[in-house]
C-alpha cells in the first residue's frame, strides 16, 4: 500500500488505570464518529464479557474502526485498539501498543496519575508512540486540572501543556480529542519490505467461525483465499474472511498495510494463533518476524477441584473451552487424596485466577474448590538437576534437595507522601529489599524487590488498606533467589492433607504453622471424637490444636452412687470414642482451604 493511502489512517490505543474512564471515553468516540446509533449505545460497548462489566475492568483487547471527518474537511480512518488496564494483563497491553502509532493517556483529573498508567505509558514511549494526555472527569467538583497536568509532567515526564480536558460522561470536548488524534498522532510508516507482515493483537474463539484473530497489517495485504503462515508455529492456514469492527463485525474484500481488522482462517484453537505472533504469506514469506513475541508464562498456580466428583469431565471440557479464548491459561490433571480428581491451573496473577474461577462457575454451572495459590519455585536437586515446582505437595524429599529458589519481583508503588511510612513497613514485613524512593511532585515512587509469594496472596489488598486506596502498584518478574525454605504439612488425625501444604520461609514457619492450626480449629466442625490438627516440617511437629469431641453426659442418670460406677460409664464412653476415631473420617469444609490464604489478615 502506498504512503498516500496510509496518510489518513490513525492507529491509537487508550492507556488508563482501572476506573479512570477509558471505556466511557471509547463509547463517546464511537458515538461521535457514528459507529453506533444513539439507541444502540450501551455503557462500555467494548467490554463484551459480563465479568468485565461487573468489575468495571477490561480483560481482552478489542478494536473498532471508525471514519471521522475532521474540521479540515478530510475523512480519516481511526483504528482504536482497546487495552486491559490491570497489571496481570500487561503482555496484552504491550501487544496492543505495538500495533499503534499513538496513544491517549487518560488520567482522572480528580485522582491524578496511578502506577499502572505509568508502567503502560513507559511501554508506549519505549515503542516510540506519540502520547496525547487527556484529563477526564473534569465535571467532578474535586477535579484539579492544573495539578493533574503537573503530575503527568513530574511522574511520567511528558509535556502536558496541550493536554485535552474532557468529561467522557457528559461528552464535553470529545471533538477536541478526535482533532488531537488526527493532528498529533502520525500515520503508519511504510516498511522496508513489501512482503506481508501482520501482528496478532488478540485471538478469541467463536462457536461458528473457529478462531478469529485481531491483526494489525504492517506491510502487504491479506485477502480471503490467501494462504498464511503463523511464524512461531510454522503452521499454514487458508484465510476465509477478513474485515473490521465498526463495532459490529463487517466483512471487507481485503485488509491493507496500516489497517487493523479481524481475520478468520478456520484455526481450531487459540494456540494456533498466539498473541504477539506474526502472520505472513506461505508462498512468499517475510524474511523475519516482527519483534517482541514471547510465550506467556503463568506465574501463579492453584488446584481447582469439583465439589462433586461427577463434574470432573465437565470441568475438563469447560477448561478446554476457556483455553480457546485465553492463551495464558495452563492446566494439567491432578489428583489429591483429600480432594479427589481436579486440575492444576496456571494463571498470570490473582485477578486472572479469580476471573477464570468466576467464569467456570458462572458460564458452566460448576461448583469448585480452589486450593491456596502458589508461585513457581526452582528446586536444585543434589544430583545437579533443576526442576520447576508449582505444587508444594510435589517437593522432593529434603535429603534430595540442595536449594530452593523463589521468584523475586520488582514492585513500583506510587503513593501520596503521607502514606510512605505505612507502605515501607508493609514491604519490610513482606521480606522486601528497598531499591529507591523518588519524589515526583505530590506523589512518591517507592521501588522494592519483593518475593512473589508474598505479593501473590494479599499484598495488593493490604497496600490499598494502609494507603486508604490511594497507592497503586505495578510489578514485573526479575529473577530467582535461593533461600531457607521448608514445606509445612497439615496433618488431621495423623493423615496428611496434601492440598493444605505450603512452602514458607524457615523464619516464618513456626508462626505460619501455629496460625494455620488455630484457624483450622475454628473451621472444622466438631465431630463425635477429638480431631487433632498438627502442622509439621518433615517429621517434626511444630504446632498442634485439638477440636474437642461432642460428648453426651453419661453421668446424668447417676444420682450419687458409687464412684466406680461412674468410672465404668466414662471408660465405656472413652472406648466408644476411640473405636469411632479409627473408622471416622473428617470432612474438611471449603473455608478451611481458603484459611491458608487469609492467614495474615
Swiss-Prot record:
SUPFAM superfamilies membership: EF-G C-terminal domain-like (SSF54980), P-loop containing nucleoside triphosphate hydrolases (SSF52540)
Cellular compartment(s): Cell inner membrane
Residue ranges constituting the tr-type G domain according to the UniProt record: 7-189
UniProtKB keywords: Cell inner membrane, Cell membrane, GTP-binding, Hydrolase, Membrane, Nucleotide-binding, Protein biosynthesis
Entry's Gene Ontology cellular component terms: plasma membrane
Enzyme class: hydrolase
Domain of life: Bacteria
Positions contributing to GTP binding: 19-24, 136-139
SMART domains, per database record: EFG_C (SM00838)
Membrane topology classification: Peripheral membrane protein
BP term (GO), one: positive regulation of translation
EC identifiers of the protein: 3.6.5.n1
Catalytic activity: GTP + H2O = GDP + phosphate + H(+)
A GO molecular-function descriptor: GTP binding
Function, as annotated: Required for accurate and efficient protein synthesis under certain stress conditions. May act as a fidelity factor of the translation reaction, by catalyzing a one-codon backward translocation of tRNAs on improperly translocated ribosomes. Back-translocation proceeds from a post-translocation (POST) complex to a pre-translocation (PRE) complex, thus giving elongation factor G a second chance to translocate the tRNAs correctly. Binds to ribosomes in a GTP-dependent manner.
Family note: Belongs to the TRAFAC class translation factor GTPase superfamily. Classic translation factor GTPase family. LepA subfamily.
PANTHER family (UniProt xref): TRANSLATION FACTOR GUF1 HOMOLOG, CHLOROPLASTIC (PTHR43512:SF4), TRANSLATION FACTOR GUF1-RELATED (PTHR43512)
Protein name: Elongation factor 4
Species per Swiss-Prot/TrEMBL record: Xanthomonas axonopodis pv. citri (strain 306)
Organism phylogeny: Bacteria, Pseudomonadati, Pseudomonadota, Gammaproteobacteria, Lysobacterales
